[in-house]
């Protein structure tokens, strides 16, 4: 499909108020062979609500942590220690194994200047990679635009109940779905009927009719491919109690799509732990840890473990001191986790100091989160356009060999 034809189809698709089913055709394709980086996949997992980084990666070697958190601090004998300073929450056996296997890079102190404590605003900053700018497209969307010529299926798949701002783009339309068994066109009844009628017309006598016919066929085929991928998918790998849609992503990778960008989230502000945090937070972390570990076990089974990297983030961390409700309030800097067989595991960036908090008892950020994005864009996806995509040049981290 030519770029012009693709663009017109997308404009018509948007004009008909359909769910964004396809940017072109969702054909399963064989892998590109001319360049290794063309096989590479980036999966982004969002932990919505503001995950408490301090009780996720516990600085058990620092007494100040326990002074700030006398009731909800994770006891040293319960921590899953990964070195002399840090250890994971007791519920995170999956993360512990990934780190000790050398598959996890932990980027400390990720944030931005003039941080917002609003879920909506801070998430928008992370989604757009443009704090305080009013930017309306997402960084994944702009990355997808830069990769249009690399793939023959859709550039971005967003598994969620609604499209994330992170994947919003100009010129391409991500595939967005939630349940593979109920992946349907969501337009008005008359519009759905129109496309169904057009798809049965056969030969079209006008270019406009042919465009609409292409849309109808593409939408129908996208629906069938998502369903068929899920039905064919070998669900033998254990993702734990809550797979967080990572098994759905695995099903599409298994099916053979050459889609390079996937985005999903642990939804509904699940990590917003203001009250009675300890048990709830550990349970949420167990779900996430088990699901991520299961996903990479699945990639190993599919022989794609060298092709896939996952970024895990939250819109902000939590305030350092516990509150009077045995929870934590909205904070600032947090960890970002980069996971994959191709990752150089270890610690990156400077951990914020517990004895140098801001006036609100929050961490001072030490790593601009867009350094992580720039690293993934250039050193993983193999594009040189990170400055254009991020609208500024950022120093990269040495996460990849």
Predicted regions span which residues?
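Feature for exported/extracytoplasmic and membrane-associated proteins, marking the mature portion
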Residues: 1-302, 321, 335-401
């Amino acid at each position: 499909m030519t770029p012009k034809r693709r663009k017109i189809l997308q404009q018509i698709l948007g004009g008909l108020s359909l769910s964004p089913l396809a940017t072109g055709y969702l054909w399963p394709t064989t892998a590109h062979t001319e360049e290794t980086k063309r096989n590479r996949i980036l999966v982004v997992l969002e932990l919505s609500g503001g995950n408490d980084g301090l009780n996720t990666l516990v600085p058990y070697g620092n007494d100040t942590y326990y002074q700030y958190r006398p009731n909800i601090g994770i006891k040293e004998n319960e921590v899953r220690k990964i070195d002399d300073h840090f250890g994971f929450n007791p519920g995170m056996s999956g993360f512990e194994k990934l780190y000790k296997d050398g598959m996890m890079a932990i980027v400390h102190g990720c944030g931005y200047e003039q941080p917002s404590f609003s879920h909506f605003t801070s998430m928008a900053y992370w989604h757009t990679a443009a704090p305080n700018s009013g930017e309306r497209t997402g960084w994944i969307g702009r990355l997808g635009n830069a990769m249009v010529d690399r793939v023959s299926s859709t550039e971005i798949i967003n598994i969620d109940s609604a499209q994330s701002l992170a994947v919003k783009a100009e010129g391409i339309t991500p595939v967005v779905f939630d349940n593979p068994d109920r992946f349907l066109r969501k337009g008005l009844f008359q519009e759905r009927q129109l496309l169904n009628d057009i798809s049965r017309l056969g030969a079209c006598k006008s270019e406009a009719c042919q465009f609409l016919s292409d849309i109808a066929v593409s939408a129908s085929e996208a629906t069938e491919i998502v369903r068929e991928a899920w039905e064919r998918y070998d669900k033998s790998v254990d993702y734990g109690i809550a797979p967080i849609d990572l098994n759905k992503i695995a099903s599409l990778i298994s099916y053979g799509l050459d889609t390079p960008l996937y985005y999903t989230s642990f939804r509904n502000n699940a990590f917003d732990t203001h009250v009675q945090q300890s048990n709830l937070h550990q349970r949420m972390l167990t779900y996430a840890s088990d699901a991520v570990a299961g996903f990479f076990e699945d990639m190993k089974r599919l022989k794609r473990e060298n092709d896939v990297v996952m970024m895990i983030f939250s819109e902000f961390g939590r305030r350092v001191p516990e509150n009077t409700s045995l929870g934590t309030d909205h904070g600032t800097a947090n960890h970002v986790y980069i996971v994959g067989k191709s990752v150089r595991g270890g610690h990156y960036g400077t951990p914020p100091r517990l004895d140098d908090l801001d006036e609100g008892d929050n961490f001072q950020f030490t790593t601009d989160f867009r350094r992580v994005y720039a690293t993934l864009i250039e050193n993983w996806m193999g594009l040189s356009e990170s400055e254009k995509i991020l609208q500024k040049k950022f120093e990269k981290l040495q996460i990849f060999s």
